[in-house]
């Protein structure tokens, strides 16, 4: 393990990259707080940032506007820094229905959610890494501005173990339960521990492949060992190990009991207010709900919706911002805002939407006023907490340009020599028929096509129409979850279908070199989806292909269209000059089609885990290499195998059930590895 970033790449900076890297690093070292990197599609923005990270050697937080792009960036940074700690921090909810009240119909909607355990583990790993390593790079979404447990509590609760240290076994077990670990003697799962004589096995909450064995003798720690929880194979012996809490929201018993007292005081004040306003129903409701939560906290240290009491648990004053991922960052860190023209407005919008929903809950007696402090950061609070920053975008917004005070570094020349797509304008009247003929031409060449429409209805109708005419087409919309969205993009690249239709999901950062045509329907309808920035971003999706072309269907030239075409032409001219000067022949970008969540694999670790698992005896027949499968495929396969296993067991076909059980174990091992 090293505490220095080591960039691994088969190529060196070229084109505008060397000058951009030098300028960004020089500005950072000079103490410049904000700067902007204006990089066109395919110019190597991620690679440029990776070079900056290696040169400045600071812990780095990269913020992306959505989970799809965050996953892509995570994979790229994992491949650039295979020997360093690259982590992923996004919302761990697969499904989330927030608590809400609709006064007009007197409807209360209970909070309902489904947590993705794997992403929860990655979040815990990210915070542990930020607190313990300098060579940490975390890729996050706006989830980073939402409340977490205070880092002071998180650090004060950790359990530090050293070989030779004297520790009472009961005290050790009590400390693990304070960290919210659960005792499970039958199955060692993540966030659990088991006791066998003087041996304790702990599966750390932030780990997915390694568990810790603590061997005691006469009250002393005799040995600390990391082992594979699946096979029991010893991986390595340690002199020292730190066990971190199972959740970011863990807190001490004293803090919890203190919070109970302050919540009671707030409840008393709030009830007096409600009674004085003659709101008897609201007062009764609030007293009943809060008393129940207080009893749960006093007895078990936890209650449903405990995050609504986070102000009391962290000891913050009313109105103070909650602790977030930014509190885990060291003060000398680097912040990179990717696709800043989208991410920055997102950060500003989060607080307002959350506030309006919670004010209704407080007004009608569902929550105490302190629930308003369980919130994302306000924009000005986020600004105050942000370390030195680099805004990255092909179309920086006015905020980024203003904050950078003119320090805009351009990355216009592509090392591949690729020039920006040719932009053509065609009439709206025949747009669908014209599009079909263009699609057929591209399919003959083995290329892919992106089509953007203005409305969901139009996208659905167009998808149906193209499908009826024998074109393999899919429709990408907001109802599709993150993992499936990534799968659709991957299937497009693999050629499982040729045309992808969408509305606003085909813009920022998606890396699809196989796409040679982007069609923008109704391009002359001025608005958010057809602004200058949106048009430049959408046109840019075809910029990674040698035959890249963008067709704008419009009956009149709008100001946004003219500005987008002028900017595209400017970039084309600069690239053509560079190609002539350096004798470069443009060639399409070639990028392997892998699961973007996988990143780089550690070959040594893979061999080691493979070796260990081959020792264990299985009933299963030879099965395919599950490690080549994607997370969504693994999840689907697991579900199907489990159903078959239970059916065989029900039919008393135990050998068949045992074979499937072992396939499931291999599949789970592959998803962890």
UniProtKB/Swiss-Prot annotation:
Residues reported in the UniProt entry to bind ATP: 39-46
Originating organism: Xanthomonas axonopodis pv. citri (strain 306)
Role this protein plays: The UvrABC repair system catalyzes the recognition and processing of DNA lesions. A damage recognition complex composed of 2 UvrA and 2 UvrB subunits scans DNA for abnormalities. Upon binding of the UvrA(2)B(2) complex to a putative damaged site, the DNA wraps around one UvrB monomer. DNA wrap is dependent on ATP binding by UvrB and probably causes local melting of the DNA helix, facilitating insertion of UvrB beta-hairpin between the DNA strands. Then UvrB probes one DNA strand for the presence of a lesion.
Domain Helicase ATP-binding: 26-414
Keywords tagged on the record: ATP-binding, Cytoplasm, DNA damage, DNA excision, DNA repair, Excision nuclease, Nucleotide-binding, SOS response
Gene giving rise to this polypeptide: uvrB
Domain UVR, residue spans: 635-670
Superkingdom per UniProt: Bacteria
CC annotations in GO: cytoplasm; excinuclease repair complex
Similarity field: Belongs to the UvrB family.
Keyword DNA repair set for record: yes
Database matches in PANTHER family: UVRABC SYSTEM PROTEIN B (PTHR24029:SF0)
Name by which UniProt lists this protein: UvrABC system protein B
